[in-house]
Amino acid sequence: MAQLTPMMQQYVETKEQYKDCILFYRLGDFYEMFFEDALVASKELEITLTGKNCGQEERAPMCGIPYHAAEGYISKLIGKGYKVAICEQVEDPKLAKGIVKREVIRIVTPGTNLNTQTLDETRNNYLMGIIFTDEHCGISTVDITTGDYYVTEVENNRKILDEIYKYTPSEIVCNPEFFHCGLDVEDLKNRYQIAVSTFEDWYYDSEQSVKTLKEHFKVGSLDGLGLKDYSVGVNAAGAILKYLYNTQKNSLSHLTHITPYVTSRYMVIDSSSRRNLELTETLREKQKRGSLLWVLDKTKTAMGARMLRSFVEQPLITMDEISARYDAISELNDNVITREEIREYLNYIYDLERLMGKISYKSANPRDLIAFASSLSMLPHIKYLLSTCESALLKQIHEEMDALDDLQNLIDRSIAEEPPIGIKEGGIIKEGFHTEVDTLRKAKTEGKVWLAELEAKEKEQTGIKNLKVKYNRVFGYYLEVTNSYANLVPENWIRKQTLSNAERYTTPELKELEDKILNAEDRLFSLEYDLFAEIRDQIAEEVKRIQKTAKAVANIDAFASLAYVAERNQFIRPELNTNGTIDIKEGRHPVVEQMIPNDMFVSNDTYLDNAEKRISIITGPNMAGKSTYMRQTALIVLMAQVGSFVPASYANIGIVDRIFTRVGASDDLASGQSTFMVEMTEVANILRNATKNSLLILDEIGRGTSTFDGLSIAWAVIEHISNTSMLGAKTLFATHYHELTELEGKISGVNNYCIAVKEQGEDIVFLRKIIGGGADKSYGIQVAKLAGVPNSVLVRAREIVDQLSENDIAEKARHIVSAAEISNLTPETEGEVNTNKMYTTKVNATEVITTEVNTAKMNTTEMVSNQESVEQPRNFGQMSFFITEDTKQKKASSEFSEKLVQEINQFDLANMTPVEALLKLDKLQKKIRSHT
């Protein structure tokens, strides 16, 4: 086999060290990829695949991209889940002896992408490190574009997920044990597009982690960083820092502090609730428009947008912190002119955090510094406007905001007003800042003038009237004197060449000019680059001041946005309490009211407490507004704890520790779960993790299964929640099981509410108003009419409902099948009916007994013949859980049936739970089998 060429050998050796990356190998003005990397990159980037002689018998697959366009291509690969290793030329090819020296200068991963052009400026790009142990889990999260760095510890899988969903990192790096902690890691990768990889063994060594953190923060003990009680968290923080050093190959000087926190400081919102409440994006379109953040975010800066997003994603549970935010918003609304002036200045501030990150990474260009200085020029105005504020948070922002006028002055003096993007092309340094730059720049542009002046001066001094300053590539610049004036040549001139009719000379002054003119451009570009790098480094040394100021700007922007939205949307300042009462008057959905015209949104009251108003059972037809009402209540509570004003005429909010929602029903095809399985998984999570201080929003529990099972589950869930020794949480419970309305008065704390509906003949009008009492109709056919269901279907539905509304549901269902079979059907549906696949279903013996006891129509022989799993017509009506008086009074067709009815009559249904009812039915079934 032929030998590889020296260059290709260098490539192969480098690639061997970065097997999990696509290697961008710098060759002149291009980054080239070879072999397998070329095959992958050409496909993913849609670029031409070629070949290159590599010294072997076959040409190596090759593709390439221009170096100046690399960031866009890198971001594409990162977005597709790849890692990219950037291998640069680290010596001047002109000076290289042999193969140019190359090194990997950075590894780009989803969590370490520095390309601010492709990152969403309104959200952080987090990298998360997770160390899982049997007792605790350490979690550290960092955004290297802003310098944010956090650490915490949690106890169980659910809390790990809560932190993941809160930060939504682009990348997770973990220890191998994390893959065995019971979480669906593949789901994180596939559904949430989070890149997940493991640390190497040495990364999560605890001693190494402590050492890494101490060295980075230059401290002798981690206690001063607040990390004393975070042993596993320190492990995660150190591991993620080592990972960054290894991939970024940079000092990471902008990671100036680490923030430890306890998760109990914030309200817990699980992933389902975040999606269902549409906090930052809509459920279907995954867009910001239509979310709560869309309503609240009227920030002017990228920093403010990220800060406000963090407010929404991490509601507070401490009254003092929340009240402080209210005070800031109140003051900004009391001083509208001040607020709007601040917002106007904020409009001209660039992303200081990410600009600072680029400066620290030495990737900032001259235009970045101009944007930075332009932003700093706004700070004195904002600081002055804040100087008169009295609320605690606004005073704190004023104190923490540094005008940074020294840095602004440095940039204004040194950097040209309209510099190029490149840093090695000159034109960066402002005239008058550096004498040598001015001289070189003058030499580059005024060299001919200097030569003409020298020529005139020498002519005058020597009397050589035909003296000329000339140039050629061999001798450079020289003074040419004809032989007729040779006697006038000064002794200090140096002869360079003798011609037949002339002599050529040089002088020290001409040599100096020659040096300036010929080397001016190269020296100028090099000097300007050095000066720019020096200025950039000077700014980087002030990273702590800049980051502190950037956070102050972000906070005032977020509060000004909340104040502006509160005023524009007529939000009010809520009151807070610790007794658990939620009292909302004329509450409105903050998003829906913005989506409908002319103030048509109907407001509603809500009252929940820890005593007799714990659970509200809400009934009413679909489309009437049950889900909107429940979501609006949850959002008002959440907004109150975010520190925002709320859409209501009055609100007194008891602090809740968690908000859980079970809203909607859909199959989770990605993870192979059915509608009902998704529903029950979420219900199980709620019942296990909610506390008496939680707020539960439950919509249509049990609708994903059969009527009887669904009703039983819904009933049992309400019993569990209402029991103060088990849970006792405040709950809004929407249902179509109207039988559940009978729980009011039977279970403590349960109250009935419904959506008011106005009937107009066969039509209905949804009044959208919550009123006391339970609904007596579902208005399903009327809703179907509103949805545009064909009239023929509606007519047939009315016929069926009239039949099913009578007590003999099971018997009538048989006739419905027959009626359907003889109706006008399409050939396709006709075939389904003829094979009994449309209107029949398997039911078990318990369902058969339940149905037939209710109707008291089937004799003993029929019961016995149907006690095993059999084909039965599907019951299209809502099966009644309660045995009617009419059923009890009917006579059985046999002596055994009569005894059965007598026994049923003795049931104390009013005090019987669903589980007890099922046990009774099981006992009856055994009697029937025994009798046969």
UniProtKB/Swiss-Prot annotation:
Keywords annotated in UniProt: ATP-binding, DNA damage, DNA repair, DNA-binding, Nucleotide-binding
CC terms in the record's Gene Ontology section: cytosol
Highest taxon of source: Bacteria
GO molecular function: ATP binding; ATP-dependent DNA damage sensor activity; damaged DNA binding; mismatched DNA binding
InterPro entries: DNA_mismatch_repair_MutS, DNA_mismatch_repair_MutS-lik_N, DNA_mismatch_repair_MutS/MSH, DNA_mismatch_repair_MutS_C, DNA_mismatch_repair_MutS_clamp, DNA_mismatch_repair_MutS_core, DNA_mismatch_repair_MutS_N, DNA_mismatch_repair_MutS_sf
Chain residues that bind ATP: 620-627
Single GO biological process annotation from the record: mismatch repair
Protein name: DNA mismatch repair protein MutS
Organism: Lachnoclostridium phytofermentans (strain ATCC 700394 / DSM 18823 / ISDg)
